[in-house]
């Protein structure tokens, strides 16, 4: 993900942190390092990269993979919304939304074996939900504070 400047990067990472929290993924988070350009600023525990375990049923394994996929989608969308907070005005998201969808659609097919309708529905629900979340003044305040530190 390319950022325009340091402020843009800070808001983007703040958005991803909020996305992780919304999807209750704090237990999967290892660290956030604003200076770690090489590894994408956010590191996860090995459990995030879970790819199956013979001791876990296939259904449980699929649900874990789906949860991580949904959280990743949420992080990307939250990044988008949070990066637009400093502008303080409504933003058109159509182009960015298409680009994110294209990326996550391929991943959803590959990792979760979801079909196009399932991916589209989940993506739109996530987008709509996060749009509401980032309209909340309390969330916006948290995002501003996180991005400033």
Across the structure, where does each feature detected by a protein language model lie?
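Soluble catalytic regions of large protease machineries
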Residues: 2-149
């Amino acid at each position: 993900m390319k950022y325009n400047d340091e402020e843009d990067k800070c808001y983007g990472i703040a958005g991803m942190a909020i996305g992780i929290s919304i999807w209750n993924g704090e237990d999967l988070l290892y660290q956030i390092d604003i200076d770690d350009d090489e590894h994408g600023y956010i590191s996860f525990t090995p459990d995030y990269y879970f790819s199956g375990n013979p001791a876990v049923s296939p259904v449980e394994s699929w649900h874990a993979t789906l949860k991580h996929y949904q959280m990743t989608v949420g992080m990307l969308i939250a990044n988008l919304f949070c990066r637009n907070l400093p502008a303080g005005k409504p933003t058109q998201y159509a182009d960015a939304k298409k680009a994110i969808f294209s990326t996550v659609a391929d991943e959803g097919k590959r990792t979760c074996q979801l079909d196009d309708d399932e991916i589209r529905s989940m993506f739109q629900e996530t987008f709509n939900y996060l749009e509401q979340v980032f309209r909340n003044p309390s969330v916006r305040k948290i995002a501003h504070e996180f991005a400033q530190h």
